[in-house]
Amino acid sequence: MHNRHLAALMVAGSVALAASVVGIAQSAPAPAPAAAPAPLVILDFKPTLSDLMTMLIQPRHQKLWAAAQQRNWTLAAFQLREMRAGFDKIAATIPKYINIDLGPTFINIMDSQVRAVNGAITSQNSMLFTSAFADLTASCNSCHEALNHAFLVMKVPEVTGYANQDFRVIPGVTPPPPAAKK
């Protein structure tokens, strides 16, 4: 009799266990199918000359100054290269502005000053940099005048407007090599 009770308990336990497993399996929701990725939307963004100058040149002008003030010549050289590349991108994006070819205009007005700033950076000469940068800034204003925008007046920065960037030299940091020209 004892065996019969034991067998009945085992059968009842097995049925209860099977019922709970089936219940759990039935109550677990099926995984949701993965959502399809949103389609790529290409915006009809047509930046103006002002947009590009504000995005590509003006911040680098200020960062170039800030880096040189900290005698971080590596960062200054980087910012100057980025500024040059910005002028190239602008001329490629907007080749003509009010019937003026921007590429040659940038070269004619800015090139000698950019080279002078580069020389000051290469020689790590703060006094030479200050003078060359003032001339570069004056060239910005000459370019604005040539493009009938004399009301846009650039100046040598008085303060650094980038509170989230440290312009000091970081000891032991090796700068990346200059990017290859395309």
Question: How would you label these PLM feature ranges?
Answer:
Residues 11, 17, 39-40:
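Heptad-repeat coiled-coil amphipathic alpha-helices that mediate oligomerization/assembly
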Residues 31, 35-182:
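Sequence context surrounding c-type heme c attachment/ligation sites in exported
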Residues 15-24:
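C-terminal segment of classical bacterial N-terminal signal peptides
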Residues 26-28:
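Boundary of Sec targeting at the N-terminus
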Residues 1-14:
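Bacterial N-terminal signal peptides that target proteins for export
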